[in-house]
Amino acid sequence: MNTLVQDIRKSFPIFHSDHHQNLVYLDNASTTQKPDSVLNSIQQFYKEVNANVHRGLYTLGQKSTEAYEGAREKIANFISAEDSSSIIFTKGTTEAINLVASAWGDSNLNEGEEILISEMEHHSNIVPWQLLAKRKKAVLKAIPLTGDHKLDLDSMDSLLTGRTRIVALAHQSNVTGIVNPIKAISKKLQNTNAVLLVDGAQSIAHIPIDVNNLGCDFFAFSGHKMYGPTGVGVLYARKNVLNEMEPYQGGGEMIDKVTIQESTWNDPPWKFEAGTPNIAQVVGLGAAVEFLNEIGLDIIEKKLIQLTQFALEEMNKSSGIHLFHSGNPSENVISFIVKGIHPQDLAMFMNEDEIAFRVGHHCAQPLMKHFGVSATARISFAVYNTQDDIKRFIQSLKNTVEILKGHSNEKSELKTKSIPEVVL
């Protein structure tokens, strides 16, 4: 496995740059680095294939369209969608969720009906529903969390009513790494009028996705969290649901016929892709799917479990560290605080050691409120990370704690763990 990771790491040029040879990158829940195959696919498109799609009858235009639609086919296969017409390209997960809130919500949600989310959601799966609820005079409800930060499914049962029209939940938390039981939740909705949207931004790069098996109506994710380019994402939608949706934006390509007074619409997915799309980035996303398939998600998941287990073991040796984590190594995101030290101070000092990780509320302020803190530090892993990365992170963390606590009489050594939950 170590040889495999080293071979994979070689394909990521950022780690071999003169400026970043000592980089320890542990902010993968935010965005992943890009392999040569993805970068080369984008460059090759602009060098050899660049033309608009779905318009030109000339050879270059046909090749561009083939590359664009070929990426759609790859993505449909990657998530086991029924066919590629259920794949809509967006700017990312955020736009995909906003698309559903507008194109589905404005047409299907009525005054007094209900939207159900949870307290662990990223703001991108909260704010669009707030805006929709305000527009439609609907009711927004949230599933609370248990003491171990999981969805309170008993409370969910009581929150589901005959007025619930959409349930929107993360597949995996970007703060705790918890993977929600989406398939079980979808079964709860089978005899209701509610549709299910899944935010798959965190799970897409390491958990095999079968949208039919999950039982979801919508599945949204971003390219940049799965080793692909920024500025491109995907919304999967079931065909019968797509047919209930009005266009999200107006413009070229999404129309069938246009007069001065009215227009008719193209078929999905093009109905929801107005204007010139982000063609090169879509091609790059197709290359990212190929990259993941070549390695195998089972191998990636196994590696991430090993890294998470090692990190948890090392961090649990230390006092002063409080983990917001269940201890399950399949949850490959670890949020934590250090007693008496603000997460921002940790990040600033550890940056001097070229340790890159995230601090803040992680676009999940309701979850921070549940924790009783304003911010946490967070490390998250990708296929190119190694145990050496974690060792360097731990050593830098120890050194930083000693420096920041050195001015006081508090003990700076990180010894056996025994502290209460800390509120910053």
PLM regions: where:
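Pyridoxal 5′-phosphate
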Residues: 1-424
